Amino acid sequence: MSLTRRQVTSAALAAVPVALATTGTAQATQRRRTLYITGDSTAAQKYADAAPETGWGMALPFFLREQLEVANHAVNGRSSKSFVDEGRLEVVLEAIRPGDFLLVQFGHNDEKSADPTRYTEPWTTYQDYLRQYVDGARARGARPVLATSVERRKFDADGNAVPTHGDYPAAMRALAEEERVALLDIQALSIALWQRLGVEETKKYFNWTATEQDNTHFNPPGAIAVARLVAAELLHRRVLAHRDVRRLDEEVPESWITWPDAAA
């Protein structure tokens, strides 16, 4: 389905920055920085009709302090290409300001070679589209951050977690080095986590229900676990400082996840 620019802009308004907290008059007089998320369904906001499916972007604010806001613009089914072609990156870049962050995680849908509206080739068009995010953020005084795609739940017969993203993570790593962009290697970190948890325990992190066995999307514990990886890497890669993060070693109750009603 094609979207008009008006429809894209209207949809993007639903992704307004979520304030993590409001404290003190000093903070009220100083604009807080915003971390914008661009990505696919693994990060996107989910609504009541999709529960218990949860995007990791819904849980990220639990690990960031009040001086940061999160604006989750990730959308189900998008690739680095279709997000640009639909005008969604333009909407983000119109809102982003100096000192903000643009976190970019695409790959799941870039892999769909049968769909020309989404497919990108890892070492050419994928990198070309990612450069548009990097260049757009830098041109506006914001800091781009690339994140390799979180891994799906897939194990071989011997119980080994199997990578599913082909050359896309390597292509992003190479681009990050070439462009001197901070890289969060969520693909490597998540597959290591799934390996530690094992075949059965990982089912508790993905959207396995009585009617569905979804090995791509998360439930609340899975989204919280991936968001914790993202926040820890933002600190480790010196994108954020210790004063910007919280709860990295603390339990976050899954009851904190809520699903609003979808906008009409």
Task: Write out the residue ranges for each language-model feature.
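N-terminal export signals
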Residues: 2, 7-28
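Serine-esterase "nucleophile elbow" of acetyl-processing enzymes
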Residues: 27-74, 90-98
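Cell-envelope and extracellular/periplasmic
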Residues: 35-37, 41-44, 64-66, 73-79, ...
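Acidic-and-aromatic substrate-binding clefts and catalytic sites of carbohydrate-active enzymes
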Residues: 49-52, 80-86
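Short, conserved aromatic-histidine micro-motifs
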Residues: 70-72, 245-250
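Alpha-helical cap/lid subdomain in secreted, periplasmic
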Residues: 88-220, 224, 229-246, 258-262
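A recurrent domain-boundary module in secreted/ectodomain proteins
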Residues: 251-259
